[in-house]
Amino acid sequence: MANVVENLGKLERRVTISLPKETVQKEIDARIQKLAKNVRMPGFRPGKVPLKMVAQQYAGQVEAEVLSDKIGQEFFTISRAENLRVAGQPSFAPKQEQSDDAYAFDATFEVYPEVKIGDLSTAEVERSTTTIGDAEIDRTLDILRKQRVHFHARGEAGEHGDGGADTAAQNGDRVTVDFVGKIDDVAFPGGTAEDFPFVLGEGRMLPEFEQAALGLKAGESRTFELKFPDDYHGKDVAGKTAQFTVTMKKVEWPHLPEIDAEFAKSLGIEDGDLAKMRNEIKENLEREAKRRTQAIVKNQVMDALLKISELDVPKALIEQDQQRLVEMARQDLAQRGVPNAKDAPIPAEMFAEQAERRVKLGLVLAELVKANGLEAKPEQIRAEVDEFAKSYEDPKEVVRWYYSNQQRLAEMEAFVVESNVVDFVLGKAKVTDKEVSFEALASASAQA
């Protein structure tokens, strides 16, 4: 007999599942007999409990298990027979009207939508490009020098000098201070510290605090007022005015290493050749620029695909992805050391919009890949693994690391598929190239 699939909406469907009671009862009896071989009850040896007593004890539980299994099996059979592409998990409910010879259940579920992708030639994508020159290399060298800064006491002679005759604290100096803060003459938590170090000009402290420390020499003190911002993270003091006294304990000036052979060696250039060092920095920056431009253009391509695509999104898939995002958020909290992160009360609703976009995009990409043969080829995956491995000290070990784990390899395969989609769309869309600086590129990729 043909199965009647009711259309309840755009994607929602319902089908009736009928299970002959005789068939169900046979399975219940078989399971109870099997269960009886191991059941333990007071006064009976294992396996010797009368079958009637086992049935009285476990019949309800076994019946529920059998019905659940049979319903699932029958639904699978029907969905295959009717070519139903079921999205998510179906829900089952007993029908109000039951016959004497069969159990009847309604299975309610959603199906995957038809995905209509519009004309790719109408899609508009802006592709960022950047050129790595001497200015970008010099800026990187400056950052690397600052990462290797050494501090020396002002006024004390050493191998790098004494930092000048002026021993007062200046911007860029590392200072060590004691401070006491009070509000209405009462000390408050976090308002007092001893031997507290920070670098002037880095913005770690509030502006009024840094300004008060500027110009002080070791042993000098200064009293000043400081108004905490209204949005200050310490709610007890936010918006309030405190009186601080800061005492300078130590003033140290920064010494940046010279860009010489020793500096190059510290960056891994064995012979200390400065030209090699600059060339390696350039190659690293170009790899980073490529990675960032790819990420930005990928987001633009995905946005463009969503704009020209028409489809209904199964609610079941959105709900599943919401739960997935909740678990990811909890894992992130756990990695940050938050106590009881796995039980954090994170509402799934906060991920509704993000989940809908992710599911919709996944359906569009699946359709595009299938229709245009954009699956990842083994040689493409290997090329991406090799490219990724180049930025590490031992590329061969990184390659082995990838190929030793199917999950890692699957992640790279997904990356290649996305790259294939991006290249395919760029070959058909209206693409505008835009030259941007490396700094602007970094800022844009951070916001993407």
Curated annotation (Swiss-Prot):
GO cellular component: cytoplasm
Top-level taxon in the UniProt lineage: Bacteria
Catalytic reactions on record: [protein]-peptidylproline (omega=180) = [protein]-peptidylproline (omega=0)
BP-aspect Gene Ontology terms: 'de novo' cotranslational protein folding; cell division; chaperone-mediated protein folding; protein transport; protein unfolding
Entry EC number(s): 5.2.1.8
Domain PPIase FKBP-type stretches: 172-257
GO molecular function annotation: peptidyl-prolyl cis-trans isomerase activity; protein folding chaperone; ribosome binding
Keywords tagged on the record: Cell cycle, Cell division, Chaperone, Cytoplasm, Isomerase, Rotamase
Compartmental location: Cytoplasm
Database matches in InterPro entries: PPIase_dom_sf, PPIase_FKBP_dom, Trig_fac, Trigger_fac_C, Trigger_fac_C_sf, Trigger_fac_ribosome-bd_bac, Trigger_fac_ribosome-bd_sf, Trigger_fact/SurA_dom_sf
Protein family (similarity comment): Belongs to the FKBP-type PPIase family. Tig subfamily.
Entries under NCBIfam families matching the protein: tig
Domain notes per entry: Consists of 3 domains; the N-terminus binds the ribosome, the middle domain has PPIase activity, while the C-terminus has intrinsic chaperone activity on its own.
Known function: Involved in protein export. Acts as a chaperone by maintaining the newly synthesized protein in an open conformation. Functions as a peptidyl-prolyl cis-trans isomerase.
Protein name: Trigger factor
Organism: Burkholderia multivorans (strain ATCC 17616 / 249)
